UniProtKB/Swiss-Prot annotation:
Residues 54-112 form the F-box domain. This is Tubby-like F-box protein 1. Belongs to the TUB family. It comes from Arabidopsis thaliana. The lineage of its organism: Eukaryota, Viridiplantae, Streptophyta, Embryophyta, Tracheophyta. CDD domains: F-box_AtTLP-like (cd22153). GO terms for biological process: regulation of DNA-templated transcription. Ubiquitous. It comes from the Eukaryota. PROSITE patterns: TUB_1, TUB_2. Residues 386-414 are annotated as: Disordered.
Length: 455
């Protein structure tokens, strides 16, 4: 039996995962009465206990299973063929564990495979090339992964969607993993971005904290999951209230026409992540559905006898994680909500200033062919606070270096995120480490919003 026939047989034995519904039950609800819920699609809810019939493929020897998954990972490297890797991860627990062991994160592999990849940092040595399609009639935005080098393409791997909601005093963009269901009440909701009245400041919210970081470990009590526990929980603040970044646009007090100036304070990413050997702490292992988060918050608040704090503020005043989680020891590296870290400041991004072209009489940036239409929305972000380089020994003579795979050189002006227009309602978005696809998409959404005093 050929390798492809094995994969086809496995896929057929479990059905088409994108169209098949599974009955499931939440283990946390079984303790309170075993209430049943409806059905779900796709593989977004890894926390769900899925009841499927055991197949002979579940009893494969680990050595054979490892060889099968490795060969599949190497052969199916791009979408849409990469859906076979996702299908194999959904066969059973042993297959899923093997896929998690072999399939690397986007930071190492440069590939987006599972939904959790959307919240993990991008590749270090290349850029992840995506494009955004805007629908003005429905006020929606869809993010796709580029499958070809062509700029104006209609096909791509869908990643995220967003919907603009205009309020009296602010604008909100709801971000979802579903192309059509864009709602905060959906299990595919993963975050949002909210602006102030002038459209000069934006706050990016995530649905779940960085529970793998020292924040969660510092306050985790015995008997409660570190994934959902916090020392003080506000039942008035739903999931999606974790502030992970703030985007600010400078006011144009002179009123002259010119490029925008923006800064992004990435509160969940320390500046040390750009140093040699640096990492982004608190990377998620899974994306927790909203229903599980809400249920966990309700169970914690009802059973805990600790003091509960209520936060009714929706403004841009600073609030610290230490106010929510209590005092922390000095040796713990904890990212504060206001954008400070005990041992390392947060990563701050700023737009690369364009140069004035005398012949064209316009401001120009080198997008290396990825942007073709002039627009005030176009920008390139670089690190504003580069870490100090470590002293290095005397270098030995080396041959000529090869060009970077991303087409960009390392150094102080290394572009971390670039966004620009290529056609009507079509924009490119290229990002790299340490930003994730979710963070990059949220930052780009802020550029779409109306700026009353920035240009």
């Amino acid at each position: 039996m050929s390798f492809r026939s094995i994969v086809r047989d496995v896929r057929d034995s479990i059905g088409s995962l994108s169209r098949r519904s599974f009955d499931f039950k939440l283990s946390s609800l079984n303790k309170e009465g075993g209430k049943s819920r409806g059905s779900v699609q796709d593989s977004h809810e890894e926390q769900l206990v899925v009841t499927i019939q055991e197949t002979p493929w579940a009893n494969l020897p680990p050595e054979l299973l490892r060889d099968v998954i490795k060969r599949l990972e190497e052969s199916e490297s791009v979408w849409p063929a990469r859906r076979h890797v996702v299908a194999c991860a959904s066969v059973c627990r042993s297959w899923r564990d093997m896929c998690k062991e072999i399939v690397q994160s986007p930071e190492l592999s440069g590939k987006i495979t599972f939904p959790v990849s959307l919240k993990q940092p991008g590749p270090r040595d290349a850029t992840m090339q995506c494009f955004i399609k805007r629908d003005k009639s429905n006020l929606t935005y869809h993010l796709y992964l580029c499958l070809s080098p062509a700029l104006l393409v209609e096909n791509g791997k869908f990643l995220l969607s967003a919907k603009r909601i205009r309020r009296t005093t602010y604008t909100e963009y709801v971000i979802s993993m579903h192309a059509d269901t864009i709602s905060r009440s959906s299990n595919t909701y993963i975050g949002k971005i909210r602006s102030n009245f002038l459209g000069t400041k934006f706050i990016i919210y995530d649905t779940q904290p960085a529970y793998n970081s020292n924040i969660a470990r510092a306050v985790q009590p015995v008997g409660l999951s570190r994934r959902f526990y916090s020392k003080r929980v506000s039942p008035k603040v739903p999931s999606g209230s974790y502030k992970i970044a703030q985007v600010s646009y400078e006011l144009n007090v002179l009123g002259t026409r010119g490029p925008r100036r923006m800064h992004c304070a990435m509160n969940s990413i320390p500046a040390s992540s750009l140093a040699e050997g640096g990492t982004v702490p608190g990377q998620p292992d899974i994306i927790v559905p909203r229903s599980i988060l809400d249920e966990s918050f309700r169970s914690i608040t009802s059973s805990s006898s600790r003091k509960i704090t209520y936060d009714y503020s929706n403004d841009f005043s600073s609030a610290r994680f230490s106010d929510i989680l209590g005092p922390l020891s000095e040796d713990q590296e904890v990212v504060l909500e206001e954008g400070k870290e005990r041992n390392s400041p947060p990563l701050v991004l700023k737009n690369k200033p364009p140069r004035w072209h005398e012949q064209l009489q316009c401001w120009c940036l080198n997008f290396r062919g990825r942007v073709t239409v002039a627009s005030v929305k176009n920008f390139q972000l670089i690190a504003a606070n580069q870490p100090q380089p470590q002293p290095q020994p005397q270098p030995q003579p080396q041959p000529l270096t090869q060009p970077q795979p991303s087409g960009q050189t390392d150094g102080p002006d290394k572009i971390i995120l670039q966004f620009g227009k290529v056609g009507k309602d079509m924009f490119t978005m290229d990002f790299r480490y340490p930003l994730s696809a979710f963070q990059a998409f949220a930052i780009c959404l802020s550029s779409f919003d109306t700026k009353l005093a920035c240009e």
